[in-house]
Amino acid sequence: MRRGLFLVIMLCISWAAMAQHRGEEYDNRQYSDIAEQEPILSDTLLFYRILHRPTDLYGEITAFNFSFIEFARRGTPHYAHPTLIDNITVRSANNTILRNLGLTDIVQPTAEHGYIAGSTHYLTTEGVPLSSARTSLFFTGKGYLGGIRATAHHLLRRGWSISAHIAARGGNSLYVDGESLNSIEAGIRLSHDLRSGDKLSIILATTLARRGIRSGTTREAFTLIGDNLYNPTWGYQAGERRNARERGECVPMMVASYHRQLSERTELLASIGGEWGKTTNTSLGWYGAATPHPDNYRLLPSYYTDLTVAHTVEEVWRRADSRYTQIDWAELYTINAMAGGEARYALERRTSRIARGEISASFRTAIANDISLRYGVRAAINASRNYKVVGDLLGADHLTDIDYYLVDDDTYSLNLQNDLRHPNRRATKGDRFGYDYTLVERELSLYASATYQTERWSIEAYASLGSHATHRNGHFEKEIYPAEHSYGKSRTIRLSPYTLSTSAGYTFSPQHHISLTASLSRQAPYASSLWLNPQYNNRTIDNPSLEQHFTIDASYKYRSAKADITASAFLHSTTSATNTLRAYDDLSATFCDIVTSDIATLSYGVEFASEVRLSSHWRTTLSLGAGNYIYTNNPTITLFADTDNTLISQSRSEMQSCHIGGVPHISGSAEITYLDYSGWACSLGVNVAALRYVEPAFTRRSERVARQSATSEEIFREFISQEQLGDAATLDASLSRWFNIGQSRLSLTLSVKNLLGKRDIVYGGYESARIRHYRSGAQHIYRPQDNIVTYAYPRTIYFTTSWRF
């Protein structure tokens, strides 16, 4: 009774602590107590590990050890690795909640079943946690100050069980000005084992979040201000820090599953679920006024050819006067006050309303003792409504909803209306303006697999065939694209994706296992890449087509009571990919819709990971990765004028042999842990990453830009060369102390990342698509603008205390 009362109190405290704030989910899995990782010293250790240990040891070790750099494993972005609950796709932001609810996760790093970067599957049919509870308080200072969380599992009568989780985080970052987080996350899981043997599971989860984020900038700005953690997105308002870039979310999620044994040989898993809510991103907008961003290239010394002016600007930056190096909110209010009620500056809130639902029916039939079939159907609909809202008028009365980029245009200055059906509408706080549209995706797929499994062999063949339909629905009628060109339903793009994969595994003994997986798939591009400008144009790209992916993966696994070892070799090829970008073209001085087609990449390499239990007290983990991640052809760059879809140019981009950004070509980590069962544990680890590159820009390598605008071989090389980032290494340490009090445990953990406090590690970067233009006498000179980079955090400390009972 006392434990239950304490849990209720802690849940209420964590809710009240954050009831007035909304924040983004933050995954603290990397800071789990060392005490929770102590080995099970029994004869069942080997059996337990074979059945229940995650299949991806390399991913388990590297997922958080390399948080100090961009780490797109195998050269694929994180969003290409989906999260599913009983075949229903959910956002990976829910991972923390799902693990705390006791769901069994199976991490698959290979491209089986069409998931090109692997997947994480959560299963509700693998049992429920025993009755227990845990509450924690934690402090970090990295991104936010600290928080509280509580989790409880309880077995009820008549086959019911319930798990609940709630966590709150809040406060300002101790390292980066302007960074903050206020969030609360909650989840509940209900499970019911029926007398017939059927299983019912319902999972509900949500995160309410608001995060003040940092932004990368050029090395020039970092050097001038003398701080690699400089953040240009905030400024002082009435003596308080205010960030112009905030990210918010409120996206509740629900998944319901029903498992039934239809016959002696056939079982059914039926699932339905979805996510409904919204995400927001704020930014400053300016309308017939100068940019408010302090790190804009026109406000830095390097922009000026007059050395006297450049020196004056440099001195202002080196003094770190926040009126110049940060957003000057007071100046924005002053300019608005002199505009007669019309906003020259406003805080915009870009909003996406998510409405996505899925349904899945999966069958498994045992044809014989060693042969089984899996087959099923999956249907999904995703209707994402996207619009812009006036967040704050900064002292102005209203904002006239017109296209301010066209005010001085010789051709279109009389066609300014963003919403022709409500011309010259005066938008006030909370009103939609600029654009309003919905992208609707409908998917239907059938799949089947056959598995042959004996004591040593496991062979599977899988195939899926689907239908993918996408259309745009415009809710504003743009004046430059009147009637059906922007308003109402566009044409529907129909594609037919498919996947073919096969895998084979052989077990030599309970310790040794090898496997080989190959997959070929054609997949639909992201919906936003199928339109020239989905914000206000119903025009689709020319010849929309499927992307092709081919993957092969060979792996070896060794498992015993003393060690777990995995080694794998992989190859992943992508062809016929498409990317669409809306940007300003400096050569034509025109806003353009830029379509990059026929993108091809190749990733191949090896991964090695091991966990060796040297004794009952000592344990080591090791990971090594080496690979090559490159673009393999020169894609086509097509520029359309954003005002009337006129073709401006088409040329090839010199991308062949460029490296994929965000992934180290060589990486390694090693950690040693000491565990004393009297209540102490400590660990020390080192992480190294080398051969890293900034993400290359397609447009600046186009023949039109790199060859035609370059006045010398030196400038041409500047356009097509790719910056290699410096090698990075960190030393991490942690210390834990726990106390067993009856049937409960109190634990304390102190973790330190980047123990040596290195402040010059570049987290990652990307090339700017913009071009710098200046004159040298009568000659026009074009050069690429500086790369945008972000630096890693210095020494960071995480402390947590938890009570499990």
Predicted features along the sequence, with ranges:
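A beta-strand signature from Gram-negative outer-membrane beta-barrel systems
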Residues: 92-138, 147
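C-terminal beta-signal and adjacent terminal beta-strands/loops
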Residues: 22, 688-706, 737-805
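Outer-membrane beta-barrel signature, preferentially recognizing the C-terminal barrel domain
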Residues: 230-253, 257, 435, 439, ...
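Gram-negative outer-membrane beta-barrel transporters
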Residues: 571-573, 592-699, 800-804
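Transmembrane beta-barrel wall of Gram-negative outer-membrane proteins
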Residues: 141-170, 175-214, 246-263, 501
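Surface-exposed extracellular loop regions of Gram-negative outer-membrane beta-barrel proteins
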Residues: 217, 416-417, 421-426, 469-480, ...
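Acidic/polar loop-and-plug regions of large Gram-negative outer-membrane beta-barrel proteins
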Residues: 199-257, 280-348, 412-427
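Signature of Gram-negative outer-membrane beta-barrel scaffolds
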Residues: 346, 374-509, 534
